[in-house]
Amino acid sequence: MSEEHHYKVHSRVLRWMKSAERIKRELDEGYEKKWRGKSVEEIKEQKKVHDIVEILELLKSKECDRFFFRTGKYMKGGSERWKMVANGILEEGGEKKVGKVEVGLFKGERGGSVVYHLMFRPTETERAGMVGGSSFGKGDDVDEIKKEESSDMSGFRYPPGVRCEMTSNGNEFRIEYRNPKNTSEVLRTLTILRIPEIR
């Protein structure tokens, strides 16, 4: 039986929960050069695939290992790192994207695991019956991680119905992001698929 996990979350992951305009200001003044000078529209597109912090509910659960593969550990930028990867589907505006949910982790100063990277990376897009491929980006393009910028997410909850609804049936973990002004309107849906059992 799997055990429950505890993670801290780096501020670079939490930033994607903010407005695109605020994210742009922070990125333009930040230490990650690749994000400087991006337009608000580019930030909005990136927000769609990075603003998925609710995945932490699945990561913390006993079900985590039924959804995520773990990679081997490696050293980069002076820190021990590893990834967790799951298959997922992101649906928005009539478009369905099949891809991977990537979780990048490093060992924090007190030995705890810190999430520094969280995103959905599309591998295929399906729209009106058409399927087209897309390429994978670099798996880990974060050179430096400011370790003091992580926070403990235990106890953090959104007010019911404000941002999303999460459900799990054992085979999939589903997050429906809703319009805060009209919670009956689903803006996008992210579904994490269970790893198939080999018999």
UniProtKB/Swiss-Prot annotation:
InterPro entries: UPF0329 (IPR011667)
Origin superkingdom: Eukaryota
Protein family membership: Belongs to the UPF0329 family.
Protein name (record): UPF0329 protein ECU01_0120/ECU01_1490/ECU08_0050
Organism: Encephalitozoon cuniculi (strain GB-M1) (Microsporidian parasite)
Species classification: Eukaryota, Fungi, Fungi incertae sedis, Microsporidia, Unikaryonidae
